[in-house]
């Protein structure tokens, strides 16, 4: 199977979350971790000093059923993004979100909360749909 290339606009913040947040270009970042995974591997190792200074806020949520810890970081005054992200995550885990939102709606909500442009969000949705239908050239 040929390796898929990621189109422009898909994942442009990956690995640059802290840099973009400190520049004020990204309001929120989200990382998930499991027991035994180092912060270096998660991607949020550099956030601690800025959390300590109050330049970035940190919200954590541990799900005892899955042993997954979600780490949400935001700029001051953007706390609502972390709170809404956690609410949506809880609704997805319970299944309630899928009675209200389509998967594309959820991708748009998450992308908006994370600070992606509308164009990047739509590029991600098209890319994700193409991965679900490998023999299809249109979405």
Name each region found by the language model.
Residues 1-98, 109, 118-139:
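A conserved ligand/cofactor-binding region detector
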Residues 104-111:
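An amphipathic, hydrophobic-aromatic interaction surface with interspersed Lys/Arg
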